[in-house]
């Protein structure tokens, strides 16, 4: 009596024919994919800038990133900011605020600081600019940290249901 008598998929049919379920699934997947891609790009660029020893305000900017990990603006000021930016009731409220994460920037920066500076110096001697050095030398070597941060961001985006209720 614990097992169903007739095997049926009618419950799946009922659920999948509801438009709001499909819309929610599409939004969740799009949010996770776009949020992960945008976050990887912005965090990697910021981490590269901070990891370069010749960057003028390197230590001050790193300190700023660490402080933002511990001090939060609060829920109400965040909501007011999102309203002023016209992000509420928009898909982009899920993607734009998560584009930069202090923790992920510091993880990437630490990884990039571990790469030999001779790679960058030899590319400069060959005439490469900073963007070329980043895209052709540093970025391919950072695939392990990109994968790690991508998992952090994707799981965080997928599991973040509270902001969908708020904004």
Identify the meaning behind each predicted range:
Residues 1-167:
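A hydrophobic, multi-pass inner-membrane permease signature
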């Amino acid at each position: 009596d614990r097992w169903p008598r007739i095997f049926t998929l009618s419950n799946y049919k009922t659920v999948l024919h509801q438009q709001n379920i499909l819309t929610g699934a599409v939004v969740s997947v799009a949010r996770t994919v776009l949020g992960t891609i945008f976050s990887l790009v912005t965090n990697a660029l910021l981490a590269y800038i901070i990891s370069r020893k010749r960057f003028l305000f390197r230590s001050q900017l790193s300190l700023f990133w660490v402080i933002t990990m511990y001090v939060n603006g609060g829920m109400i000021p965040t909501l007011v900011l999102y309203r002023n930016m016209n992000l509420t009731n928009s898909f982009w409220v899920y993607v734009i605020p998560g584009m930069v994460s202090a923790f992920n920037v510091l993880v990437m920066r630490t990884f990039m600081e571990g790469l030999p500076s001779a790679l960058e110096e030899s590319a400069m001697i060959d005439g490469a600019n900073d963007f070329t050095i980043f895209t052709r030398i540093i970025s391919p070597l950072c695939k392990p940290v990109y994968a790690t941060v991508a998992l952090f961001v994707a799981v965080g985006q997928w599991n973040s249901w509270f902001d969908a209720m708020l904004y």
